[in-house]
């Protein structure tokens, strides 16, 4: 196999040059981080599961007209995505108080919010991804007013759809983080959903027991992290046919 050019390595994924113009190969790692990489570890099989879960959710969102960067899954750990200009903002949609919101505002974890709340965080590891307002975003040119209108509209649609999808399999979507990018097609630009959607960037609780089924199990040393990710995939009907002992998958090919 020809060597591929690595373009970027993040905490949970590696991006390689794609086989077609305007595409990238997104490789999912087993590495796990929390608290802006202050805590690090490895969750065996996480990359395989997140690849499948993100593929499934991106496809479902595409079916209701949400534009995404996803093209197709290539193998157990990789998917082909469109190359986009990432907007340096993490968008967090909250349905239930948890995590930093509970800490910041003194709201007991598990409190149902009166309505879904959108928060924005500037993507900058050196600054610990500070929370920012829409005024900051537009004033500093990270996104235009029209970009933000599109992002809010898409975020609420994504939240509505995913909330129902997860509830249908007995999971509460507490909150989640997503990213958007600008997809250029000749002179036309549109905002599309990028990055991934998986238990790495969603808070998912069992609807009956409130048991955590996401990366909080790693953050808070709750144990059984691999089993939680597998349970999410199982409920969505996408657990790979290979047994859990085979979940490591192939190593990255360069």
From Swiss-Prot:
* Annotated Pfam families: SAICAR_synt
An example of a GO molecular function for this protein is: ATP binding
- Which biological pathway? Purine metabolism; IMP biosynthesis via de novo pathway; 5-amino-1-(5-phospho-D-ribosyl)imidazole-4-carboxamide from 5-amino-1-(5-phospho-D-ribosyl)imidazole-4-carboxylate: step 1/2
Q: Which GO terms describe its cellular component?
A: cytosol
| Nucleotide-binding in keyword set | yes
Keywords attached to this Swiss-Prot or TrEMBL record, sorted alphabetically, are:
ATP-binding, Ligase, Nucleotide-binding, Purine biosynthesis
GO BP term, example: 'de novo' IMP biosynthetic process
Catalytic activity, EC: 6.3.2.6
- InterPro entries xrefs: SAICAR_synt/ADE2_N, SAICAR_synt_PurC, SAICAR_synth, SAICAR_synthetase, SAICAR_synthetase_CS
* Gene3D superfamilies associated with the record: ATP-grasp fold, B domain, Phosphorylase Kinase, domain 1
Catalyzed reaction equations? 5-amino-1-(5-phospho-D-ribosyl)imidazole-4-carboxylate + L-aspartate + ATP = (2S)-2-[5-amino-1-(5-phospho-beta-D-ribosyl)imidazole-4-carboxamido]succinate + ADP + phosphate + 2 H(+)
Family as reported in the entry's similarity comment: Belongs to the SAICAR synthetase family.
What is the protein name stated in its UniProt record?
Phosphoribosylaminoimidazole-succinocarboxamide synthase
Q: What organism is this sequence from?
A: Acidiphilium cryptum (strain JF-5)
Organismal lineage: Bacteria, Pseudomonadati, Pseudomonadota, Alphaproteobacteria, Acetobacterales
The gene designation is purC
